[in-house]
């Protein structure tokens, strides 16, 4: 809440969010374009094959296996695949299977033209051609992964063809800040439909909205990420119609987030984006709830009525308590995974812009954590993965914070 969370919240002032959120939409879109694995850190078994790409239309998604991708490349600004022999492979509208046509196949070129028009209707950020290409590719894949009804799949494989609330929230945020608010609203509409009565979400859902019954407990960070995404998708509350439609979802989530803050000012222990059972509060959950409470308080300021005003004050106070506890409990150790340690955690990137106000101590912790988690030029999420392969979402989170 502004630059001094505790003080501002104590005085119930409106959160001053706009000044530090409208930054680097490229990095945000890249984070989300490749964040499909963020909520899918575990699978029931090792997948026998990873997809090299995806083809799709509004109704069907098809993975491109690596053994079929040799020498292939997507046409610029589209999901039409040019094979090594020059032929074009794509999924026509309404088709159930990919079609392979000649190099100038009119159907393929029409699909590519429509996708380029969709990109042009928004913004494709980036300072260089390579950055713009990465952002465009991410946005096109996000568009494909958002299924009819707004289900934003984590990936097009049997292991991850589900909706994780945090993945979907980041997807909605990326689509919103790049000018594709209709798609962002659809994603948030799906999340609204899968929200539980207590304001929480299942750890993941099927594309038809049914919860996945695999024994995973609810992950509390969803009650932070969804309000944050709703705030961005509604143009920070300026789209009053969308803000009004999402208000019941935001209200229930933020009420639960505020009620979850314990006497120590922190949320309870529980799984976060690592999807592991925890014995102590994690930085990832605390950062998500802090972003969500700030965003919800801002949205409440634009709502009519005494009840909304009371909630704004309550959520701002909860954000102030949480921010103070994060600084007091996590700060002395350099913002590690747990208050008592636990090693570096990429979630430190979620404490500063564009999720929260600038803080020199947080900025220093981000730089230190990056150095400790860097592997082969990228980043792993935390200590357990040191020596392993970098994670794109963790790496992109540091890029966003840079």
Name each model feature, range by range:
Residues 15-32:
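N-terminal Sec-pathway targeting helices
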Residues 24, 32-161, 185-186, 190, ...:
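Low-complexity, Ser/Thr/Pro/Gly-enriched N-terminal "stalk/linker" regions
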Residues 114-128, 169-181, 225-241, 288-306, ...:
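Well-ordered alpha-helical scaffold segments within catalytic/enzyme domains
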Residues 125-137, 196-198, 228-284, 338-345:
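Active-site acid/base region of carbohydrate-active enzymes
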Residues 134-150, 180-202, 246-266, 316-334, ...:
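Long, well-ordered core segments of solenoidal/helical folds
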Residues 150, 202-218, 263-281:
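Acidic/His metal-coordination segments adjacent to aromatic residues that form catalytic metal sites
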Residues 161-261, 286:
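Aromatic-rich carbohydrate-recognition surfaces in CAZymes
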Residues 217, 280-291, 301-396:
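Extended ligand-binding clefts on enzyme/binding-domain cores
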